[in-house]
């Protein structure tokens, strides 16, 4: 047992170091690739967000770290930038529904054949959270220059239970209940 403890601590240290490298890489890529990364955010505010992520690394699980990286990139408020970690195999989209926003609310616009009865249904809530509340809570992680773009992109993010779970907005990382 004594031998395992240092190995576990070493693995944890290595993971924290790797996450710091990932964060540094993301920041460097933003500053090198983006033509005007600080057009919509002051550089000092961006640096505060990055430092907050850096300090929180020891407490973050994988999903929390991915959320933190998404927030860093979304903070520059550019709809053409974004991390798609929550659309990867690590966080499968288990929902068989696709939704879009309309003036009257959020509606199912496509779905698998076994859920065809839900086509055109209005989504009221996910895991008891009103859909509009979910969009508001997720907005700082969705890359967008304005509120319209957040509303447009939100359904892609909200169909990923792992994302909502990482935010503490649904109980399970691999499923949720949709209310119509």
Show where each model-derived region lies:
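Flexible, low-complexity junctional segments that flank or bridge functional domains
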Residues: 1-180
């Amino acid at each position: 047992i004594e031998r395992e403890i240092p190995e576990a601590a070493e693995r944890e240290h290595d993971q924290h170091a790797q996450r710091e490298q990932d964060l540094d890489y993301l920041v460097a890529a933003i500053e090198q690739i983006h033509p005007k990364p600080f057009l919509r955010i002051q550089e000092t505010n961006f640096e505060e967000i990055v430092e907050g992520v850096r300090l929180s690394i020891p407490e973050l699980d994988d999903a929390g770290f991915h959320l933190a990286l998404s927030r860093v990139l979304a903070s520059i408020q550019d709809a053409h930038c974004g991390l798609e970690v929550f659309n990867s195999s690590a966080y499968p989209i288990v929902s068989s529904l696709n939704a879009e926003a309309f003036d009257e609310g959020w509606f199912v616009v496509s779905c698998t054949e076994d859920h065809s009865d839900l086509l055109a249904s209005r989504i009221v809530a996910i895991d008891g959270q009103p859909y509009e509340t979910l969009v508001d809570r997720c907005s700082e992680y969705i890359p967008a220059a304005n509120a319209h773009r957040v509303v447009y992109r939100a359904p892609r993010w909200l169909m990923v239970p792992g994302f909502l779970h990482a935010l503490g907005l649904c109980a399970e990382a691999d499923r949720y209940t949709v209310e119509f």
